[in-house]
Each structure stands twice: as C-alpha cells, then as structure tokens.
UniProtKB/Swiss-Prot annotation:
Pfam hit, one: OTCace
InterPro entries found in the cross-reference section: Asp/Orn_carbamoyltranf_P-bd, Asp/Orn_carbamoylTrfase, Asp/Orn_carbamoylTrfase_sf, Asp_carbamoyltransf, Asp_carbamoyltransf_Asp/Orn-bd
GO annotation (BP), single: 'de novo' UMP biosynthetic process
UniProt GO MF annotations: amino acid binding; aspartate carbamoyltransferase activity
Protein name: Aspartate carbamoyltransferase catalytic subunit
Keywords noted in UniProt: Pyrimidine biosynthesis, Transferase
Family: Belongs to the aspartate/ornithine carbamoyltransferase superfamily. ATCase family.
EC nos: 2.1.3.2
Annotated organism of origin: Methanospirillum hungatei JF-1 (strain ATCC 27890 / DSM 864 / NBRC 100397 / JF-1)
Residues reported to bind L-aspartate: 79, 160, 221
Amino acid sequence: MNHIISIHDLDRDQIDRLLARAGEVTAEFAGKEPLKGKILGLLFFEPSTRTRMSFESAMLRLGGSCMNLGGVEVSSMAKGETLADTIRVVSGYADAIVLRHPKVGAARLASEFSEIPILNGGDGAGQHPSQTLIDLYTIRQSMSLDNIHIGLIGDLMYGRTTHSLAYALTHYNARIHTIAPKGLGLPDSIHDNLEERGATVIEHDSIEEVISDLDVLYVTRLQRERFPDPAKFYDVSSSYRITPSLLTDVKEHLAILHPLPRVDEIDPSVDNLPYARYFEQARNGVPVRMAMLTEVMV
C-alpha cells in the first residue's frame, strides 16, 4: 500500500486489517522504534488540531520525527509555487507526507508527483480516510460494523468525514439514515454512488423520527468555511442540536460520534451520558494513525 488517498483505495479486508492493527499497535511496538530515522512531513494548508497532532503523536510514539511545513503563508506557495512542485521538493526531505488541502482532489494530485507515500488528511469537501478509519474503529469497540443503522446529521453537503464514512460502510451492509438542513444533504452524485454500491440510504426530515432506530448517531458541524454564501450559513446555523431530552428512547448501546471540533450541535450536557463517544473517538486517532503509518512506512 503506497498511498492512502481515498477510502475507495481500501477494500474491506484492508480496512479490517488496519482496524485490527490499531488495536494491537501500542502493545506490539512497546519499547520498539520501528520508524526510527524516518521523517513524516506534515503539510497542512487548512486549520487542524486533532488530525495534525495525532499524526505527530503517532509518529513520535513509533520512534520517528516530524517536519511541519505550516500554512501557505509561510511556504513558497505564497510566492506562487504549485502544489506539484512543493510535493516534489518535500519528497526529497521526508519519508511520507500527510497532506491537508482546501481543494478536492489535491491529495490525489500530490500522489502523482510524490516519490513517497501520501496520506490524505482531508481535501476540501472531498474525503478524509484517516478519520473514517478512526470512526470505524470507535464503532467496532462496542458493536459489530455489520448491518448497523447509522444516522448522519448535519452538513452532509460539505462534510468530507460523512462522505468517506458512508462509502466505507457500504462494505458492511449498513443502513444509512441522513438528516440535514435544507440544501445541505448528501450531494446527488454521492447519494447515487452509494446506492450503486448497494447501500440503503434513507432521508429524514427530522432526527426525532429515526433516533430510536439508530445504533450510531454521527453528528457534524456546519462547514462554515465552505459556504459560498455566508448568509446561507446563518439561515441554518441553529437548525439542529443534540440534547439529553432527545435521547430518552434510544437503544442502550447507541454511540454518538462527532469528528470534532464541536460548535453548538451537541449540548455539553450530553458529554457525561453513556452514549457520548466523541472524546474517546478523538483519542483513538493515535493508534489508528500509528497503524496507518506502519502500513505505508515499515
């Protein structure tokens, strides 16, 4: 496996292998440094806390080191250098690259010019495969991935984590329930592609009508930075919120996930309920990304 650009690059066996490795990696490499002498280049052209820091933590725990390019404003891209040329240059400095970029397809483009593995840390409204592996790993800690009912609520138009997760779940015969503000549902192309892959996708007008059927509720924030019209954001900014009163008749094993950052779509009073798994989900970023790094760098 040279690059991890899209969840489409992974079949079910590869996903299951990475998830299994994530569960074993901390013990497997305790006291060992399999990536000693290796350098991970972190090229983040959009803001990031969890993805950047968990990749860095994963690399350090494996004995390697990191080189952080920073944003466009501190790189030669501010002088007009192309992404392709930047990748060509950094390929000579590092042993793998994690790339986050605002343009859909940027990671795929980077892989065409890179001599070292590229891991997609999020490309605009496209995909976020490492987050999807974390999501699947977190779900699998409490239930089987097969045949689950999952609700995707929030900005499904621009939310790349929901796109990647929905595609991954086609390997597991999931029932995908979508709840989104008007105009922010799954793009038609993704909806149609999911159904072509055999997925059952059911659209709902409100979370109340489906919450009691769900095994997993995946909540996302509105992607304010991707709205072409800022006025549209304010029109829908308070259109959904998960509160304890919504959770009075849910399945006992319900897992509420959120890729974070949270704005106001989950009330903080939900945090201490047994259903809240989003901070555990964030912690899982380290072992999952350790598994990914050893997959492409060892």
